[in-house]
UniProtKB/Swiss-Prot annotation:
Subunit structure: Part of the 50S ribosomal subunit. Binds to Obg (AC P20964).
GO BP terms: negative regulation of translation; translation
Keyword entries, A-Z: Ribonucleoprotein, Ribosomal protein
MF terms in GO: mRNA binding; structural constituent of ribosome
InterPro entries, sorted: Ribosomal_uL13 (IPR005822), Ribosomal_uL13_bac-type (IPR005823), Ribosomal_uL13_CS (IPR023563), Ribosomal_uL13_sf (IPR036899)
UniProt keyword Lipid metabolism present: no
Family per record: Belongs to the universal ribosomal protein uL13 family.
CC annotations in GO: cytosolic large ribosomal subunit; ribosome
Protein's gene: rplM
Domain of life the protein comes from: Bacteria
Keyword Ribosomal protein: yes
Biological function: This protein is one of the early assembly proteins of the 50S ribosomal subunit, although it is not seen to bind rRNA by itself. It is important during the early stages of 50S assembly.
Name under which the protein is recorded: Large ribosomal subunit protein uL13
NCBIfam families documented for this protein: rplM_bact (TIGR01066)
Amino acid sequence: MRTTPMANASTIERKWLVVDAAGKTLGRLSSEVAAILRGKHKPTYTPHVDTGDHVIIINAEKIELTGKKLTDKIYYRHTQHPGGLKSRTALEMRTNYPEKMLELAIKGMLPKGSLGRQMFKKLNVYRGSEHPHEAQKPEVYELRG
């Protein structure tokens, strides 16, 4: 009887992928990128091993939101001081911090814990179409849908 081969750190081959966020919807892009970071697009996916690829997202400032989310969606953070609850609308986030907006959406879709933090480190988000990872020879990745 043959057993299912399990991936381990020495057998994983990681690729570098470039995803263009221009005109894409935030949630649809984020869920696909989270699956790539986890390695679910590979036949060698193993839940307890980080089998995912590196992802570079460009044109983060051109991400789209549907409906009235630009004005109604609010991002909260706390300074850890009394009365330190801060809030920003999605429009302010997209204008001033588009990288953070994408990172927060993708981070929420990854596993919580040390494996999820390790997967999140393989994500690179940039405003504009330039990125400093040309030496890794990234492949352009076309999203489904």
